[in-house]
Amino acid sequence: MQQAKAVARTVRIAPRKARLVMDLIRGKQVGEAVSILNHTPKAASPIIEKVLKSAIANAEHNYEMDANNLVVTQAYVNEGPTLKRFRPRAMGRASQINKRTSHITIVVSEKKEG
């Protein structure tokens, strides 16, 4: 069974927030997944939709798969490098602010007949 993959690395969204959206599309057909992402009011939705469309395009172009038969087989978010920033606080102190990034991976494959 052939698989097509798309990865977006070091995306400026917290992995915890991106996983909430990713859980909605895992195991779904790609058409259904795209419509779910269009109707999900989260900041991660357009980013994940772009990665999903890239995976679909990779499947069509590189492996000659039919887009109508594609299913999201794997969808996961890993933690990327953290950008560390500092916020000034009272009495000359400073608090560290972690700007988290994500590595978003989506794998699609053709669903089995039957």
UniProtKB/Swiss-Prot annotation:
Q: How does it assemble?
A: Part of the 50S ribosomal subunit.
Alphabetized PROSITE patterns for the sequence: RIBOSOMAL_L22
Q: What is this protein called?
A: Large ribosomal subunit protein uL22
Q: Which organism is it from?
A: Bacillus licheniformis (strain ATCC 14580 / DSM 13 / JCM 2505 / CCUG 7422 / NBRC 12200 / NCIMB 9375 / NCTC 10341 / NRRL NRS-1264 / Gibson 46)
What this chain does, per the entry, is described as:
This protein binds specifically to 23S rRNA; its binding is stimulated by other ribosomal proteins, e.g. L4, L17, and L20. It is important during the early stages of 50S assembly. It makes multiple contacts with different domains of the 23S rRNA in the assembled 50S subunit and ribosome. The globular domain of the protein is located near the polypeptide exit tunnel on the outside of the subunit, while an extended beta-hairpin is found that lines the wall of the exit tunnel in the center of the 70S ribosome.
- Which Pfam families does this chain map to? Ribosomal_L22 (PF00237)
Top-rank taxon: Bacteria
What does the UniProt keyword field contain? Ribonucleoprotein, Ribosomal protein, RNA-binding, rRNA-binding
One BP annotation, GO:
translation
**Source organism lineage?**
Bacteria, Bacillati, Bacillota, Bacilli, Bacillales
Identify the GO cellular component terms for this protein: cytosolic large ribosomal subunit
| Similarity-based family | Belongs to the universal ribosomal protein uL22 family.
An example of a GO molecular function for this protein is: rRNA binding
